[in-house]
């Protein structure tokens, strides 16, 4: 009689050694989501939690997200990677279109990762990776590697410094280009934007009288819901002729350095910016112990210079420190 503990061909293969976790050298940002018509979000929720614990700033969109929503988030948030789970059977079309749209928006550098358990068969995985998807993980990968090693691969592959690729000039930003605005904000966050460009931004912003609205409050008080409703009403009342910029700040975790940038998931009034959308939305991690990140004044100036008629700054909820937004 065989020993029931003896492995068989059907026995899952477990990772034998714990991987050495890759701690990001640069700020790594990811958009995570479950694909359109897909309500299976348990796996992507697990992945985004592990990403966050490993020091990644995660913009989580939740489930049932279209390619345009994912791409617009990737462009405006200036991320290095996108991670999507797809269990609904349309993965071939979805991932190909995702790669195509990123390239069309000037974000071909964004690496796309995905998974769909046994729904995505090996031949489809090979075809999608040949098309431009960085990696589709299979059930066998999960058995052999384990979740930490899988996430490790994502983090290591995307640990690149986007501030090394700043625009040579601000012409595109001053014309309202969201892709350039996103990269300029990345440069400001890193303290890498050249001083002459900062001076140009500040001068361009000073020429325009743009109101800045700060939204703050305790956790769960409805800050993001209020922001979304304000966006919706401004868009309706002004027939999308008003350009709005939203800067949403969330705290960085003290342990691990990651952050869940969860305000965008509550926004229902955003439209893809390449299809007439009048809203630029950027999530920021504090990266310090303060409620308002360093460089916020120049980030607001950049949105004004890019044509924003109204700037909304939403702070994290951390006791009385919320009042710090008044100074900006």
Segments the model singles out, each with a brief description of its role:
Residues 1-5, 10-28:
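Non-catalytic signal-transmission and effector/linker regions of two-component phosphorelay proteins
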Residues 16-17, 147-211:
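Extreme N-terminal, non-catalytic leader segments
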Residues 34, 217, 248:
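The Walker A (P-loop) glycine that initiates the GxxxxGKT/S ATP-binding motif of P-loop NTPases
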Residues 37, 44-54, 58-150:
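Cofactor-cradling patches in redox/metallo enzymes
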Residues 38, 218-221:
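ATP-binding Walker
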Residues 189-210, 221, 226, 230-325:
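Nucleotide-state-sensitive switch-loop elements of NTP-binding domains
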Residues 213-215:
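Hydrophobic anchor at the beta1->P-loop junction of P-loop NTPases
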């Amino acid at each position: 009689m065989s020993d029931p503990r003896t492995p068989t061909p059907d026995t899952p293969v477990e990772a034998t050694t714990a991987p050495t976790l890759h701690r990001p050298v640069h700020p790594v940002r990811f958009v995570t989501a479950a694909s359109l018509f897909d309500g299976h979000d348990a796996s992507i929720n697990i992945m985004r939690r592990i990403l966050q614990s490993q020091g990644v700033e995660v913009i989580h969109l939740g489930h049932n997200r279209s390619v345009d929503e994912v791409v617009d988030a990737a462009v405006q948030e200036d991320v290095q990677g996108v991670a999507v789970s797809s269990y609904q059977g349309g993965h071939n079309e979805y991932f190909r279109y995702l790669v195509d749209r990123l390239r069309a928006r000037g974000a071909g550098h964004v690496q796309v990762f995905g998974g769909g358990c046994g729904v995505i068969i090996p031949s489809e995985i090979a075809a999608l990776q040949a098309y431009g998807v960085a990696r589709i993980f299979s059930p066998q990968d999960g058995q052999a590697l384990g979740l930490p090693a899988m996430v490790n691969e994502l983090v290591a592959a995307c640990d690149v410094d986007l501030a090394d690729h700043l625009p040579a000039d601000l012409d595109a930003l001053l014309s309202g280009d969201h892709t350039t605005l996103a990269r300029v904000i990345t440069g400001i966050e890193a303290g890498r934007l050249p001083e002459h460009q900062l001076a140009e931004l500040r001068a361009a912003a000073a020429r325009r009288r743009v109101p800045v609205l700060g939204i703050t409050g305790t956790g769960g008080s409805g800050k993001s819901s209020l922001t979304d409703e304000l966006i919706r009403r401004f868009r309706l009342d002004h027939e999308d002729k008003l350009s709005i910029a939203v800067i949403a700040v969330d705290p960085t975790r003290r342990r691990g350095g990651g952050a869940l940038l969860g305000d965008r998931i509550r926004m229902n009034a955003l439209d893809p910016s390449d299809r007439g959308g009048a809203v630029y939305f950027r999530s920021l991690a504090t990266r310090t112990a303060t409620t308002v990140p360093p460089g916020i004044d120049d980030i607001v100036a950049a949105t004004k210079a890019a044509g924003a008629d109204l700037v909304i700054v939403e702070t994290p909820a951390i006791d009385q420190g919320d009042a710090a937004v008044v100074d900006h």
